[in-house]
Amino acid sequence: MGGAAGGKTYLGWWGHLGGPKQKGIITYSLSPFQQRPMAGFFKTSTQNMFRRVMTEGLYVAIPFGIAYYIYCWGKERNEFLNSKHGRHLVEE
């Protein structure tokens, strides 16, 4: 099962598959001293973050507000039902 295939099916190892050499491929590179990977990062990132927060704020704030209201209501209701007055009302 393991190992390289033998006979007519073996083409060669990775990078040396036995095919014709590639021609006509031109690559360009830029010196690391000429690159500016962080150019404009702080200027554009803060504006982009502010824009995204403003556009997506309602999609997050409204469900969060509803969930917080339900949480507060449940907590208050639980405290009431575990008080003397609450237990007295439940028994009736």
UniProtKB/Swiss-Prot annotation:
The segments annotated as topological domain Mitochondrial matrix are 1-50
Supply the InterPro entries for this chain. Answer: Cyt_bc1_su8, Cyt_bc1_su8_sf
Per the record, its GO cellular-component terms are: mitochondrial inner membrane; mitochondrion; respiratory chain complex III
Protein's GO biological process: mitochondrial electron transport, ubiquinol to cytochrome c
Question: Which keywords does the record carry?
Answer: Electron transport, Membrane, Mitochondrion, Mitochondrion inner membrane, Respiratory chain, Transmembrane, Transmembrane helix, Transport
Transport among the record's keywords? yes
The protein's location, in the record's own words, is: Mitochondrion inner membrane
Residues annotated as transmembrane: 51-81
The question of whether Electron transport is a record keyword is answered with: yes
UniProt topology in membrane: Single-pass membrane protein
| Record-annotated disulphide pairs | none
Q: Which PANTHER family does the protein's record reference?
A: CYTOCHROME B-C1 COMPLEX SUBUNIT 8, UBIQUINOL-CYTOCHROME C REDUCTASE COMPLEX UBIQUINONE-BINDING PROTEIN QP-C
- State whether it acts alone or in a complex, and with which partners, per the record: Component of the ubiquinol-cytochrome c oxidoreductase (cytochrome b-c1 complex, complex III, CIII), a multisubunit enzyme composed of 3 respiratory subunits cytochrome b, cytochrome c1 and Rieske protein, 2 core protein subunits, and additional low-molecular weight protein subunits. The complex exists as an obligatory dimer and forms supercomplexes (SCs) in the inner mitochondrial membrane with cytochrome c oxidase (complex IV, CIV).
The job of this chain, per UniProt, is described as:
Component of the ubiquinol-cytochrome c oxidoreductase, a multisubunit transmembrane complex that is part of the mitochondrial electron transport chain which drives oxidative phosphorylation.
Q: Which family does it belong to?
A: Belongs to the UQCRQ/QCR8 family.
- This chain belongs to the protein called Cytochrome b-c1 complex subunit 8
Phylogenetic placement of the source organism: Eukaryota, Fungi, Dikarya, Ascomycota, Taphrinomycotina
